[in-house]
């Protein structure tokens, strides 16, 4: 840039998925309210691409371990069932013929362990528990069995 912009000349935009809130939280403890607001902001920042990413500025990879760690919070705070329908489709697509799974979907690759690949099992189950929606369990049950067999 040929000049140093002033703060009043700079605009920033939060790019995120259009999620309908599923719950609210307010309490008398300002610190807990602040923590809740930070978690809310973080989840919005990490779910702008149809699946949850590990960070919005580096890899932007859909690690299963990150998904497993945050599914409960994300699904409690938002109606995120469409995101999980999309993301589980990606996990089904990257499954290998022998039942093996990478640690990341949709791109594949990454590093981790069973907790990362286990997203194919835990995400459909948690979606059922949190929303009463059994479609992911029905759709990916064979994938789950295949992965367990691997």
Where in this protein do the model-derived segments appear?
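Solvent-exposed loop and edge beta-strand segments that line ligand/cofactor-binding
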Residues: 51-64, 105-117
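Extended acidic/polar, glycine-enriched regions
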Residues: 1-34
């Amino acid at each position: 840039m040929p000049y140093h912009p002033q703060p009043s000349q700079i605009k920033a935009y939060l790019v995120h998925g259009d999620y309908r809130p599923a719950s609210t939280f307010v309490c008398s403890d300002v610190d807990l309210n602040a923590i809740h607001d930070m978690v809310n902001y973080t989840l919005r920042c990490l779910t702008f691409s149809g699946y949850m990413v590990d960070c919005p500025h580096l890899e932007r990879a859909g690690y299963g371990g990150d998904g497993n760690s945050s599914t409960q919070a994300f699904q409690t705070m938002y109606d995120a069932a469409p995101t999980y329908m999309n993301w589980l489709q990606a996990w089904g697509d990257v499954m290998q013929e022998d039942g093996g799974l990478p640690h990341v979907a949709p791109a594949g690759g990454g590093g981790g362990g069973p907790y990362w690949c286990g997203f194919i099992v835990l995400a459909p189950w948690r979606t059922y528990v949190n929303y009463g929606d059994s479609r992911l369990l029905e759709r990916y049950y064979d994938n789950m069995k295949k992965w367990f067999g691997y």
